[in-house]
Amino acid sequence: MRPVVFSLILLTVSHFTASEEPTWQTVEEVLAVVGSTPILYSDITLATLVHLVEPEPMESLEDYRSRLLGARIRLEVEFRDLEDTGLLYRLDLETGTYRDALISRAGGEEVLGTSLRHEGLVWPDVDELVLRVAAVDAFVEQRLRPRISVTKEEIEAAYQELLVNEIAVSDEPVPPLSAVRDDLHTLLVERKLNEEIESWLERAEEHQEVMRFGR
C-alpha cells in the first residue's frame, strides 16, 4: 500500500469566481505528528543536512530518510516529555557545543547556510533542532547516567561470557581480568545506559500520541 502523506494546503482565493475551481498549492508535507507537534518534510530535510543519524553503507535515500524520520520522531517524543514534566528547565544545556557540532557535520557554517537557503530553511530551524538534541543528551548525561552502577560480580560475569568463553574455542591466550576490567566496566555502563534510555522512551510514548503518515 502506498503510504499516506498529509499536507498543509494553501488555498489561493484571489481571482476566481464561484464557478471556477480553486487553486490548491502544497505548502508543507506533514510526515508525522507527536502530540500536537507536526514533523514536517522540512524537518527531515534539515536532519539530512546535519546528519542527525549517519547513512548506512549502500543504503538508499528512501530508506535513509525513513530512518531519519524515525529518529526525529523519537527525538520529539523525548523532548516533549522533558518539557511536559518540567525537567527541561532544570537541565544544564550546552546548546553552543551542540550547535557547533551539527554545523560541523553539515560541512561548516558557509556550506550549511547555502543549503538552508536552497531548501527554504532558516537558522532558527537549526536552533530548534539543537535545543532538542542538547536537552535529550543533557537528560541522559545528568539524570540517567548517574543512576548506573556496575558491580564486581557483573564485571566478572562479563569477563567469563565475553572473553573466556569466546576465546576458549581458539588458541589465543585470554587476557587477565585486570587488563580488561576498565573496558568491561565501560561496556556494561553503556549497555545499562541504553536500557535506561529505552525504558524512558517507552514511558514517554505512553504520554505522547504518535502518528506516522509515511516515508
Task: Specify the residue positions occupied by each region the protein language model found.
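Positively charged n-region of N-terminal signal peptides that target proteins for export
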Residues: 1-3
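Hydrophobic h-region of N-terminal signal peptides that target proteins for export
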Residues: 5-17
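Peptidyl-prolyl cis-trans isomerase
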Residues: 21-26, 30-33, 39, 61-215
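Short, conserved catalytic-motif segment at the N-terminal edge
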Residues: 47-63
